[in-house]
Amino acid sequence: MANILRKIIENDKGEIKKLEKTAKKVESYADAMAALSDEELQAKTEEFKQRYQNGESLDQLLPEAFAVVREGAKRVLGLFPYRVQIMGGIVLHHGDVAEMRTGEGKTLTATMPVYLNAISGEGVHVITVNEYLSERDATEMGELYSWLGLSVGINLSSKSPAEKREAYNCDITYSTSSEVGFDYLRDNMVVRKENMVQRPLNFALVDEVDSVLIDEARTPLIVSGPVSSETNQLYHRADAFVKTLTEDDYAIDIPTKTIGLNDSGIDKAEEFFNLENLYDIDNVALTHYIDNALRANYIMLRDIDYVVSPEQEILIVDQFTGRTMEGRRFSDGLHQAIEAKEGVPVQEETKTSASITYQNMFRMYKKLSGMTGTGKTEEDEFREIYNMRVIPIPTNRPIQRIDHDDLLYSTLDAKFRAVVQDVKRRYDKGQPVLIGTVAVETSDLISKMLVDAGIPHEVLNAKNHEKEAHIIMNAGQRGAVTIATNMAGRGTDIKLGEGVLELGGLCVIGTERHESRRIDNQLRGRSGRQGDPGESQFYLSLEDELMRRFGSDRIKHVLERLNADDEDIVIKSRMLTRQVESAQKRVEGNNYDTRKQVLQYDDVMREQREIIYAERYDVITAERDLEPEIKAMIKRTINRTVDGHSRNDQEEALKGILNFARQALVPEDAISLEDLKEVGEVTKRSVNYDAIKVYLTELADNVYDRQIKKLRSEEAIREFQKVLILMVVDNKWTDHIDALDQLRNAVGMRGYAQNNPIVEYQSESFKMFQDMIGAIEYDVTRTMMKAQIHEQSREHVNERVSTTATGNIQAHQADANGQEIDFSKVGRNDFCPCGSGKKFKNCHGRKQF
């Protein structure tokens, strides 16, 4: 282990030497740039663009370009990047993670690689964790970029598509990670290229990169629409059931936070819902509601995982920032289960129209880089998932902060009393204190204790984040006491007030260790910025969640031996700190494995998503007649259906083909059973199914030609073809996403049967994808053949399709005339009326049976 650490340190030192060499080359241009007039310095941008067009690479332009930005920053912003900031900029340009401590000027560092990469004209995205920081940084740094002749755009969620398009067309675009992801998904739901807002993804520089690419990695971005509200009753019934259970009826796995029914719980469920077998295939949907109700009632904790707003809404609490996540909902029905648990109105369940994880979103950029104060602990993940190295950048001044060893108490009460005593001592002498908590309820408890102790303070948590930047900025003033949930206010520096340096600087007190060392380091990093003095101290108890989940029995035994009766006894030792870090490493390993598994599942969907999106883009951008594509779909549908029926008894097969032809290809009186028998040269022993395929294809071609003649112009024909294909593809893709979600839940259970869930998911999802392609082609065929075609205004078609594209649809199976097919009288072994050639129980009756 020591050898590995030594090798890592040596590699970092070697990298730093290379960076210093390039940085010195940048610095060598300083005098030459300073001698230029404003106009001459500004003209450098156009010169660089021309040199790039003539074949010079960005790497070759780097020293001069960085020097131009340094001189421009001095003239426009009054700031001149240090050598360590130049080094950080080089790391970012190379597509790696620059680990720079708090207060080292990451925002200014970013200007150099952003400017250089904007020279290509392909666009640069600067990604921030919230819109406040996007607007702040775009305004402050935008002055410099504009002065140098580059355009700057801000992409906000409130902007119209036209405004977003304008922002993305700028040389440099500031945006949040979620908005870039949602825009990508929405771009792949439009029906015309001119409605897309993004350009091809070129270079992204992500601020607080660990927050976006690590903490948010398991969070999918989802565009969805409502489904029937009748299912809401099932949420209430499932909630009522799980509230009747005792602790013996279910099992919770604390490390993984999973829950499931025991045998007694299963028996109670079967009795409650009047079932013979809870896990029969017919009850898959019900078990999903029960699982969510179990999680909502026994895993998800109020004021930790979510809060109930005064407006009776469930608001998610971000576990890494402590902020409420406005507009975000737990997916897959969990949010509705929590609403049922808390007795607030259950909102309509939604159906996913498009989704993508942050991991696959950002891996689509040609080049990706990021900045953070704490990335080294996650270096393996950055390298393996994103192919990014983490390079620690030296501080401009030596760090003076004193990090004290952890203090461990036996109970929460003893720990919190000690925290208040420490705060009181520091407050009395005027030293500012920042108290970090991991949960809203802890913030509220400490706040109450400080009030009782007569200590004035500010509270910054998920219930009060509007003023967070202002509160954090003042947290370094003399006598200031601030309670902050986790890393609320991240991105805003804490500057020390007058006389605070002499008092020892800002003291950061952690009331609990987070499961990630990185989050603890972020809290510590709020103190001691730019070489200022400071302190950090963590208070722990054996009742903390991390200690309960992974705490060493050795620590518990030491406490018991010291004094079993005195809960105020405290342990302070390096051994304790090492034990805690060992526990954190285990949790980090579990979390990494989970994120890696999420990526493995999403990679399957990514491949399918890219195929569908590429096909959509081809249709959207097509200036040609799409007749060859549609006729090919019709032919494949005919061949697939005839082949499917040909495996049945001869009489049944011919009747099935006849039903298909009448329902999907031609008017009912245009074909008979006798026609098929004649064409198929039917004898008692054989049928020429190939001849039937040719016959049906000829009939379909004739119908297609008649349908198209109803449209009077080439433009109208292309418009109809595009609308037809896109509406069907979008509907089927939405259903497919939902089916993949259900499949993922189902295969997860197969791990218990010694099957590899990922392999099962890959295999079955591929088959489902093939089935979806077949369903798309069938629906295009049927709609093309059976639709009542007439000229519509372009605006009407736009309105109709845009409604579908946003997922705001009610899905149902309808015949070509828009009438719903009546499935109520179809037997389970009858052929499905949709004409697929499958038996009803294996087709549209699958959910019913």
From Swiss-Prot:
Is the keyword Transport in the record?
A: yes
Catalyzes what? ATP + H2O + cellular proteinSide 1 = ADP + phosphate + cellular proteinSide 2
**CDD domains for this protein:** DEXDc_SecA (cd17928), SF2_C_secA (cd18803)
Q: Does the keyword Electron transport apply?
A: no
Give compartment(s): Cell membrane; Cytoplasm
Please give an example of a GO cellular component term from this record: cytosol
EC numbers, comma separated: 7.4.2.8
| Family matches, as InterPro entries | Helicase_ATP-bd, Helicase_C-like, P-loop_NTPase, SEC_C_motif, SecA, SecA_CS, SecA_DEAD, SecA_motor_DEAD
Kindly state which keywords UniProt assigns to this record, in alphabetical order: ATP-binding, Cell membrane, Cytoplasm, Membrane, Metal-binding, Nucleotide-binding, Protein transport, Translocase, Translocation, Transport, Zinc
Cofactor stoichiometry and binding?
May bind 1 zinc ion per subunit.
Domain of life of the organism encoding this protein: Bacteria
Where is Zn(2+) bound in this sequence? Answer: C832, C834, C843, H844
Q: Which cofactor does it need?
A: Zn(2+)
The residues the record assigns to binding ATP are Q85, G103, E104, G105, K106, T107, D493
Its quaternary organisation is: Monomer and homodimer. Part of the essential Sec protein translocation apparatus which comprises SecA, SecYEG and auxiliary proteins SecDF. Other proteins may also be involved.
Name the family.
Belongs to the SecA family.
> What functional role does this protein have?
Part of the Sec protein translocase complex. Interacts with the SecYEG preprotein conducting channel. Has a central role in coupling the hydrolysis of ATP to the transfer of proteins into and across the cell membrane, serving as an ATP-driven molecular motor driving the stepwise translocation of polypeptide chains across the membrane.
What protein does this entry describe? Protein translocase subunit SecA
